[in-house]
């Protein structure tokens, strides 16, 4: 993946500097590494700004809620997924007329689909099951949004969507929705502070990948 490729590039650069330990080579490769660092910092700064400014875009019309899936462990939501579900529970209680798509397929190490896990969690908390629709085929953020929108059209639900996911994930989700010509808003779930750095760095690579490919 793109994270591994970036790591290989940095490692290769360090190896070349050490191997060609002559003044000229050292100067050339030092400039290469410096240029790489400057570009990397520019990318990180831009992505950080975009993430921070797209965390919450409050709906201005009736929408369908779309909750993006995350890892399931032993048929239970992971911490990140639980954060999304708790925000969903709060938002659905505050807006009792809204319908909700729970989007997420079943990963290789998951006993049930992410959609089913989310459904069970919200129903156990008291959400009316008739308000919940399961989209259980998606394997990526793009598929989450695309397949959810297809289900929305099939069920004749409001076409504008409110995406609920963790704050670090909202910008990429909103970008994908725009590319699919789907009008979208954002309600972000809080991320535990000890998880945020890891997810944040990984998300930056995800954003770069999204714009390149």
Spell out what each predicted region is.
Residues 20-32:
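Membrane-interface helix-boundary motifs at transmembrane edges
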């Amino acid at each position: 993946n793109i994270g591994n490729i970036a790591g290989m590039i940095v490692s290769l650069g360090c190896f070349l500097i050490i191997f060609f330990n002559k003044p000229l080579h050292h100067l050339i490769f030092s400039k290469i590494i410096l240029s790489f660092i400057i570009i990397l910092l520019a990318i990180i700064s831009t992505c950080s700004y975009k993430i921070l400014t797209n965390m919450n875009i409050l709906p201005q019309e009736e929408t369908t809620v779309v909750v993006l899936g995350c890892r399931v462990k032993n048929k239970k939501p992971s911490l990140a997924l639980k954060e999304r579900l708790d925000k969903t529970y709060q938002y659905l209680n505050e807006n009792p007329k809204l319908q909700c798509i729970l989007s997420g397929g079943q990963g290789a190490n998951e006993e049930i689909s992410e959609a089913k896990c989310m459904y069970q969690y919200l129903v156990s908390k008291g959400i009316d099951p008739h308000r919940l629709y399961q989209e259980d085929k998606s394997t990526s953020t793009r598929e989450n949004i695309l397949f959810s929108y297809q289900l929305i059209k099939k069920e004749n639900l409001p076409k504008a969507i409110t995406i609920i996911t963790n704050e670090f994930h909202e910008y990429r989700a909103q970008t994908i929705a725009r590319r699919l010509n789907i009008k979208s808003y954002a309600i972000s779930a809080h991320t535990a502070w000890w998880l945020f750095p890891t997810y944040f760095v990984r998300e930056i690579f995800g954003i770069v990948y999204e714009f390149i490919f």
